[in-house]
Amino acid sequence: MRHRKSGRHLSRTSSHRKAMFQNMAVSLFEHELIKTTLPKAKELRRVAEPLITLAKEDSVANRRLAFDRTRSKEIVGKLFNDLGKRYATRQGGYLRILKCGFRTGDNAPMAYVELVDRPVGGSVEAAE
């Protein structure tokens, strides 16, 4: 039985899942909008939102935790210098998941994942 087991396996090993969501979170913070499948988008929320919450309080320990989870100095800088300040007054719900139809080929449900209150002006195609 699967009672009280949280998270989706997504037909991957645990190390593959961890690496995939780490890379997806870095891409999300870099571009502020990514397109992925709906189940991956829902799981990405569990990885990305705690990182933004961590970035709201700037400390060396929090920066080290963020680097451990993203492995990117540039993204850690953006998290603490831009995103942490942008969402300082927001209590949560930093991501928006928008369904965008089905993928050609396997008919998988697709979704855009974007940061709420992101500056508008970039094209959607650039993030894909």
From Swiss-Prot:
InterPro entries (UniProt xref): Ribosomal_bL17, Ribosomal_bL17_CS, Ribosomal_bL17_sf
Stored SUPFAM superfamilies: Prokaryotic ribosomal protein L17
GO biological process entries: translation
Record has Ribosomal protein as a keyword: yes
Entry GO terms, CC: cytosolic large ribosomal subunit
Pfam families the record matches: Ribosomal_L17
Alphabetized GO MF terms: structural constituent of ribosome
Keywords, ordered alphabetically: Ribonucleoprotein, Ribosomal protein
PROSITE patterns in alphabetical order: RIBOSOMAL_L17
Subunit structure: Part of the 50S ribosomal subunit. Contacts protein L32.
HAMAP family: Ribosomal_bL17
Homology family: Belongs to the bacterial ribosomal protein bL17 family.
Protein name: Large ribosomal subunit protein bL17
